[in-house]
């Protein structure tokens, strides 16, 4: 398992489109290379321009993706709630990221 702590994603923004066609901007907080263990990569996103709430928390969304054959990033997929091993790995990497920052 590897992850890209050295990549500064603070200014990378992507647009997600929901089922109703609404577009929302998100900033990439962290990418995680989980190909060795799970065969896919992960990305942690925060709504663009979001601020911490009164309790110091901020909404973070996690998705998985696989690279296309041409090397481009594929579509984002929700991570199944019952995939404990994946969530444990994401939490471990995220906590390490927080400790480093």
From Swiss-Prot:
Pfam families: DUF1292. It comes from the Bacteria. It comes from Streptococcus pyogenes serotype M1. This is UPF0473 protein SPy_2112/M5005_Spy1795. Belongs to the UPF0473 family. InterPro entries: UPF0473.
């Amino acid at each position: 398992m590897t992850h890209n702590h050295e990549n500064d994603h603070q200014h990378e923004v992507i647009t997600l489109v929901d089922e109703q066609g609404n577009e929302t901007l998100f900033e990439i907080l962290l990418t995680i290379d989980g190909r060795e263990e799970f065969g896919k990569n992960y990305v942690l996103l925060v709504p663009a321009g979001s601020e911490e709430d009164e309790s110091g928390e901020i909404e973070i969304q996690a998705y998985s993706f696989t690279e296309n054959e041409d090397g481009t990033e594929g579509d984002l997929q929700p991570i199944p709630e019952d995939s404990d091993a994946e969530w444990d790995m994401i939490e471990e990497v995220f906590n390490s990221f927080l400790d480093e920052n």
